[in-house]
């Protein structure tokens, strides 16, 4: 499945929640009718079956993290192999992606922008350039902006935006040095309560 390149607000309206695809810190529901489906007047939402609800939740999480269908299924398979709660393992794997960590540290205004920084070789992990967005970050890894990329206006703008967001407790960021440490994997209580990972587990368990 190809990556969606259309209007970001349209995706959030389709899912009925803010997917944090735009760079602003103001909630999207203050910018558009988030509860109204895309279309001139908003299509009436049909009553979903249990399968439909599960599928919609999977699509929502997949879009939040910008992961393609095959990648997402592979993350689920890996999460199921790990010890512990499969749903929580899945979220931890998604949060551990390099592009997501770059976003969480405030170096990219959105996950899409963070992914672009990674692919353009502007990001280093433990002093080495890594240009794979799905690269898994481990506890105590140091993620930093490459020296020649530190002057980019988009990085500076992203750091200013990040000052207005709640800082993740599992990360330690030095905005001046443009580097941060992935102290630990996030716990479920650290992440959005708007995600129901149990629905995704139910979907893939069938």
Swiss-Prot record:
Belongs to the universal ribosomal protein uS4 family. The lineage of its organism: Bacteria, Pseudomonadati, Pseudomonadota, Gammaproteobacteria, Enterobacterales. PROSITE patterns: RIBOSOMAL_S4, S4. Residues 96-156 form the S4 RNA-binding domain. One of the primary rRNA binding proteins, it binds directly to 16S rRNA where it nucleates assembly of the body of the 30S subunit. The keyword Transport does not apply. GO terms for cellular component: small ribosomal subunit. One of its GO terms (molecular function) is rRNA binding. CDD domains: S4. InterPro entries: Ribosomal_uS4, Ribosomal_uS4_bac-type, Ribosomal_uS4_CS, Ribosomal_uS4_N, S4_RNA-bd, S4_RNA-bd_sf. NCBIfam families: PRK05327.1, rpsD_bact. Keywords: Ribonucleoprotein, Ribosomal protein, RNA-binding, rRNA-binding. One of its GO terms (biological process) is translation. This is Small ribosomal subunit protein uS4. Part of the 30S ribosomal subunit. Contacts protein S5. The interaction surface between S4 and S5 is involved in control of translational fidelity.
